[in-house]
């Protein structure tokens, strides 16, 4: 069913949790989408952007800044997820998680031992391209996306990593 939806709608970009995101629903979603991609015809292609939340990825290649105003909107929005925050108030830790992403991303994406990125909060992603039945890692043209930038600028032009 998901493969049919992909073929019918031909999305340019698909977001999904990365394979090892620990949470069983996230892992199941990853498997469902990857299985669906495998059913698409060879000419089908799109960007695949893997997200992380419960388990960090060892090799993200894209940082997206979240400015303090948007972060406050996210935290406020999460408070309406009553069942989740009643058992685990992770909305309170969201700013610290995004700060830690800046630390990790500065090293993993910017290069070990380099200067930290001049941002306070971010999310990390792994950008790949589904092409000819294969998932190929692709580094975005712009590895760090400022909060006020349009994502298509960074994702519209990608270069194939390693050749």
Regions found by a protein language model. Name each.
Residues 1-163:
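Metal-dependent de-N-acetylase/amidase catalytic core
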